[in-house]
């Protein structure tokens, strides 16, 4: 989604840059053993298309200086807005600091908080080193919220100066899915950029010892959004019990179809050619089932309606949601409008 966002920003000529982390291994690759059982493999990624900016700087993580290096994805490489990626996998760092950018979704809580600091504080500091003066800092989820504490210190502890520059996108429709960490751990990890725990609790108006990243983002930002009309409604209801949060709008997520979608299928759609759409879909479906058969040995009938879960299969993504209301689901399947095949 983030990559698609940057492609669209490039096409629209929007004045925007992206900042992320450069993963050495990323999320694990699922491979199959000879007996078809799954194997988890951590393969080192290759980034020959990135440019070394020569920018190196230090941030504080766990009360310790950590070196950060910035790499750059040129807009012309993939026709995307400028993207900077940060890594700590450097010989100047100790091994623990190097591993901060090794694995996405690291199970170690301290490593995860360190990643949040790198993204937020490291990203905001990079913007300063580039001599940019952005009108807006956009947080995609609350993973980079530590940037708000960096900006708070930068603007002489004037929260309104942070708020007028900060916007926030929330994706998670369940409060339990929003990140919370022990506030004492966050403080020990240097997440709060020198603020005391009492100062943090007062600043984001919460006395809990569990630091709620999303709640802090909603109180620090001038504006937030959910990722669809319904999700916006769910988010407003979910956070309504909290006072002094910013307005939550609805902005529907979308993908840059020019990159990922089948071009011929869209040509038929634009031409209103229902026969062409149906024929092309059947061809693509058959090709997909051939890949599944090759990898798993399972055969699927292209003439049977098939639901495909094209996402990481994690419980909080709620794969069973589609059939939660079985009567409504059956009604959708029985509609004779040619949309389901």
Predicted region positions:
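Catalytic cores of carbohydrate-active enzymes across secretory and cytosolic contexts
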Residues: 1-341
């Amino acid at each position: 989604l983030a990559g698609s966002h940057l492609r669209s920003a490039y096409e629209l000529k929007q004045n925007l840059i992206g900042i992320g982390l450069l993963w050495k291994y990323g999320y694990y690759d699922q491979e199959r053993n000879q007996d078809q059982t799954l194997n988890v493999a951590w393969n080192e990624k290759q980034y020959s298309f990135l440019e070394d900016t020569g920018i190196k700087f230090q941030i504080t993580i766990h009360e310790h200086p950590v070196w950060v290096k910035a790499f750059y994805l040129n807009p012309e490489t993939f026709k995307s807005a400028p993207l900077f990626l940060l890594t700590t996998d450097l010989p100047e760092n100790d091994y623990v600091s190097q591993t901060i950018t090794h694995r996405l979704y690291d199970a170690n809580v301290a490593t995860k908080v360190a990643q949040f600091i790198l993204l937020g504080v490291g990203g905001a500091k990079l913007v300063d080193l580039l001599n940019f003066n952005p009108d807006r800092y956009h947080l995609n989820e609350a993973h980079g919220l530590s940037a708000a504490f960096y900006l708070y210190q930068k603007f002489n502890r004037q929260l309104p100066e942070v708020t007028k520059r900060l916007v926030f996108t929330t994706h998670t429709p369940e409060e339990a899915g929003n990140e919370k960490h022990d506030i004492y751990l966050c403080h020990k990890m240097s997440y709060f950029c020198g603020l005391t725990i009492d100062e943090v609790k007062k600043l984001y108006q919460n006395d809990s010892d569990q630091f709620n990243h999303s709640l802090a983002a909603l109180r620090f930002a001038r504006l937030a959004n959910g990722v669809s009309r319904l999700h916006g409604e769910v988010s407003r209801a979910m956070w309504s019990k909290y006072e002094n949060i910013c307005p939550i709008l609805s902005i529907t997520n979308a993908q840059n179809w020019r990159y990922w979608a089948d071009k011929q299928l869209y040509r038929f759609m634009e031409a209103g050619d229902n026969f062409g759409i149906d024929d092309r879909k059947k061809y693509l479906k058959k090709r997909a089932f051939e890949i599944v058969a090759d990898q798993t040995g399972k055969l699927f009938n292209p003439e049977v309606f098939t639901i495909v879960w094209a996402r990481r299969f994690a419980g909080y993504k709620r794969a069973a949601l589609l059939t939660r209301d079985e009567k409504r689901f059956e009604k959708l399947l029985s509609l004779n409008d040619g949309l389901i095949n």
